[in-house]
Amino acid sequence: KDIEANHLELIDLVVVNLYPFKQTIEKKSKWEDAIENIDIGGPSMIRSAAKNHSDVSVLVDPSQYQEFLEERKKGSFNESYKAKLAFEAFQHTADYDAAISKWISKEKNLLSSKYIEAYPLIKTLRYGENPHQKAFWYGLSNIGWNSAEQLQGKELSYNNLLDLESALTTVLEFGYEEKDILTTNKFASVILKHNNPCGASISNSASQAFLNALECDSVSAFGGIVAFNSNVDSATAKNLKDIFLECVVAPSFDEEALEILKIKKNLRILRLSKDKFPKKNQTSTKSIMGGILVQETDDSEDKTENWISVTKKNPSNMMNLDLNFAWKICKHVKSNAIV
């Protein structure tokens, strides 16, 4: 009645861009600045419009605009499209609230009574661990594997991503990129198969590190994943091309090395720089029946000078170096480990 009495038009479209809370906290802003960038009215308008989606269309992200305009040209919006917009709207506000909750929990060291994580869909994978299983990749934009440059090869599979993660976290035990390792002589290479290291080595060059790792178990290395913590040069590439591999990941590749590796058309070549790594103090999760288990990732760094010998014979410095290497690798072996 009020609408009719005042000759008002009905609202049939609501477009809201929320305050940039995530962008604000990424800049490590002050508490007050972050609080100021928590939107109040925006989420209320979005939720109201989404609830009434049969009569109102709601847009929450500029990426939706083009599709909306194309649908508009067709005439009236069908119910399924409006429901899709409502679904995306509620997901958007849920993600926004999750980011706020997680940030406050971290800033004030508060244990959350509910485990809330919101990751956008990166892509639908071809299949999961087996061909009959569906699989999806969710994650943060421009961080981790989502930011890796794939220089060649087919799209990454579910198993590829699991193996790449294990290979990279193992090789990271010895530094990453040239500036980290030139002074320590720890050029490292790890060969991984079925989510377990089957060979690992540190040496005075990436090429020799790979050859040493290959000697650990050249049979299991067939069809495996190789990770380096340093630049891959032509000498290393020549050794890599002699064996069938699924993926190679490194912080950088020489142009000549890429030319050699690209002869193997199906080899997935990935370049991932250190500045794309997530911040430390991340958590890892495991699904169990009826829930999940959450723990801090194991980022501890053991130093040999802190070790205590409990035998009459003390290990030599060389033995300690070997034991330290074995200890680092053992940490990433999934079954009972003998390294």
Task: Describe each PLM feature range.
Residues 12-16, 96-98, 104-339:
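ATP-dependent carboxylate/acyl-activation modules
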Residues 1-108, 176, 196, 204, ...:
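Active-site loop-to-helix "anion-binding N-cap" substructures in soluble metabolic enzymes
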